[in-house]
Amino acid sequence: MLLTRKSTSTGASSSRLVSTLARGVSRAVPTMDRRAFLRRSGMGVGAGIAVSQLTLVKKAEATTPARAGMTGTGKIEVKRTVCGHCSVGCAVDAVVENGVWVRQEAVFDSPINLGAHCAKGAALREHGHGEFRLRYPMKLVNGKYERITWDTALAEISTKMLDLRKASGPDSVYVIGSSKHNNEQAYLLRKWVSFWGSNNCDHQARICHSTTVAGVANTWGYGAMTNSYNDMQNSKCALYIGSNAAEAHPVSLLHMLHAKEAGCKMIVVDPRFTRTAARADEFIRLRSGSDIPFLFGMLYHIFKNGWEDTKYINDRVYGMDKVKEEVMAKWTPDKVEEACGVPEARVYMAAEMMAKNRPSTIVWCMGQTQHTTGNAVVRASCILQLVLGNVGVSGGGTNIFRGHDNVQGATDVGPNPDSLPGYYG
């Protein structure tokens, strides 16, 4: 059949475009079936819509400095700083125009982030210039916040605190510090609380890595990460137990991926299959809270097969004979499997990979520390590294991923209720 369009009473077509298409179709295909008719009709309608929209399209004009409210003569500076989110410490170049932080770039020559940014770091500027940023003192009056001056705020707060101390004593006030404070701020806060006459102060480390500080310090004298993020590229094997670095410390995993390119083996031990586990060579699922049985199960196989570093232990470690005695007597493979649900073959595999690929490192975060047995879990991890002779060597050690950007420094000198700055007392 032919595709034609009915004319109006004057004989003229109501659409020149459709008439042109109809004549073309009739010349090219004198007859067509129903399917071809529907297909070609759709093409014609689409072409008509496209042509009708041409007059609505307009080239955008370039925004001039005057139109944008700028003169183009602003002073631009680049300030080198450090990301304030997690403990990785990625370097950031902040671009500042007329004193305002306008944009940022990751630092490519930084040995830590190597020009990389995670989603948290990319949003760092919003901490200073976000719409919800508090820029001045506010006071709640009749259910609404009103702006007040700094002098008024300091005077009212000071008066109220002195009244509280007079009525109820200095311990009536509890001061919460911060792991976001720099060392100087944390130190001054601790001193201020002491001058106030109280010891009621603390910060995020209490529910973060305070168990790490105590556990590591009680094992070899100081409670801190022994190596560094970029040193992990020298590791031959890495055991992640209690850490989901891919999400909590994304840039840190960059160094492990570089290490894997060089042949490093990666083991992830976790109750959940995480994004970190997705990058591992081996994933071992254990029962939540059973880290100690698993680690001691690894020690059992290390001692049984003679994989321990005997010279290192004799030269540098005290009391390992008692640890070995307890492990061999109490943490046999059947007891370990009963406690943590991991078959003997999987525990053996993890122990063998760590022992035969040295230097090997162990990584943990709050998957270990946020337990009532956090100190003991941390000590078990440290003992494993001492047995293998991995402490004090490049590519080994305990890589403890802290939660906040200065939680280590704030813990060292800041508002801990159980010690003075520098862990005195």
Listing of model-derived features with the role each one plays in the protein:
Residues 190, 334, 352, 382-385:
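Active-site phosphate/pyrophosphate- and oxyanion-stabilizing loops and adjacent acidic/basic residues
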Residues 354-425:
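A glycine-rich, hydrophobic/aromatic-adjacent loop/helix-cap motif
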